[in-house]
Amino acid sequence: MRDEIATTVFFVTRLVKKHDKLSKQQIEDFAEKLMTILFETYRSHWHSDCPSKGQAFRCIRINNNQNKDPILERACVESNVDFSHLGLPKEMTIWVDPFEVCCRYGEKNHPFTVASFKGRWEEWELYQQISYAVSRASSDVSSGTSCDEESCSKEPRVIPKVSNPKSIYQVENLKQPFQSWLQIPRKKNVVDGRVGLLGNTYHGSQKHPKCYRPAMHRLDRIL
């Protein structure tokens, strides 16, 4: 649950940063509130033994019928951020499920995987997948094979990690990680160790990018 929620917050925040309407401090405040709210909301609806259970409940959704998702709107209110300044797609759905985070741009398009924790992924591949998902927000959502320069790089990135499993729902334990991970460096050459997506250091081998990964059918939250 910690990895999935941290990934979701990182993904949403990358979209917000791309819109470039909020200051660094505003983004940090919004990210802290969003992570706290997601933990509070999902902790009683998380079923690792049956990931599809509660899927519709764990659905963050924006469309023409509801242009403000309640969870995102609450995070904005509690962080004093204008929802319109997030710059999120007008039609976007994010499913936060055990072992997998999926997204769909447009109500009629197919969902795709943002990050999967089902198998062994190199952590740079997880970042790469999230970066590609972000790039799809401003590109043709029907295309699914190419990667832009940023999404295909293997540069280090860090997603916030809640290190204490006994206190993951306490607000004070969620604040600290956000001070550094939002400071995303631009292109860097990394030869040996890499900083992992969830804060670990490891040595990755050269592999071809996975990029687009279609997801299985998902249950929408009824608006």
UniProtKB/Swiss-Prot annotation:
Expressed in oocytes after germinal vesicle breakdown. Expressed in testis and in olfactory epithelium. Keywords: Disease variant. One of its GO terms (cellular component) is nucleus. It holds the Pfam family BTG. It is linked to Oocyte/zygote/embryo maturation arrest 8: An autosomal recessive infertility disorder due to failure of the fertilized ovum to undergo zygotic cleavage. Adapter protein that bridges CNOT7, a catalytic subunit of the CCR4-NOT complex, to EIF4E. Facilitates maternal mRNAs decay during the maturation of oocytes and in the fertilized egg, and is required for the maternal-zygotic transition (MZT), zygotic cleavage and initiation of embryonic development. Belongs to the BTG family. Interacts with CNOT7. Interacts with EIF4E. Interacts with CNOT8. This is Protein BTG4. The lineage of its organism: Eukaryota, Metazoa, Chordata, Craniata, Vertebrata. The gene is BTG4.
